[in-house]
């Protein structure tokens, strides 16, 4: 088996072009390609290019809407809900995190709940975004019981 080494810029470009060619719009492709590149950069290969074929399959099947726009709803001063409209979770987080950060700074604590989105992907880049804003973050996702 031949190993091909790619630079981070090449990974970003490959991921973005692949997503664009398979149904994502520019914004969604850029957000997800950046996350894929960061996963590769940080050594989390299971959330880097490895995920690209599954994203493409979801886009082609219609399970994932690569052009959807999440809807942000403020439930209370410290609870933000984002309806994913079947887009990928990184797109949802891109729209919801600024609202979460604002609410946490105004109220001391805040929660971001998302639904109807697909695959959370790597979650540390989002918690890093919150930490860079001077806050503490805890991220979790639901999944089938494993115990």
How would you name each of these model-derived features?
Residues 1-22:
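Generic N-terminal amphipathic, Lys/Arg-enriched alpha-helix
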Residues 15, 100, 126:
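Aromatic/hydrophobic pocket-lining residues that form π-stacking "cages" and hydrophobic walls in ligand
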Residues 20-23, 42-46:
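N-terminal and secondary-structure boundary signal
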């Amino acid at each position: 088996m031949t190993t091909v080494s790619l630079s981070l810029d090449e990974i970003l470009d490959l991921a973005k072009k692949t997503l664009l060619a398979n149904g994502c719009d520019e914004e969604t492709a850029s957000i997800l390609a950046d996350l894929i590149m960061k996963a590769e950069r940080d050594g989390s290969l299971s959330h880097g290019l490895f995920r690209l074929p599954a994203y493409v399959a979801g886009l082609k099947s219609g399970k994932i809407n690569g052009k959807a726009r999440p809807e942000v709803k403020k439930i209370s001063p410290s609870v933000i809900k984002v309806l994913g409209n079947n887009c990928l979770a990184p797109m949802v987080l891109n729209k919801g995190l600024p609202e979460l950060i604002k609410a946490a700074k105004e109220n001391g604590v805040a929660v971001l709940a998302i639904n109807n989105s697909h695959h959370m992907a790597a979650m540390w880049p989002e918690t890093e975004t919150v930490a860079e804003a001077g806050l503490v973050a805890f991220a979790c996702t639901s999944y089938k019981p494993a115990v």
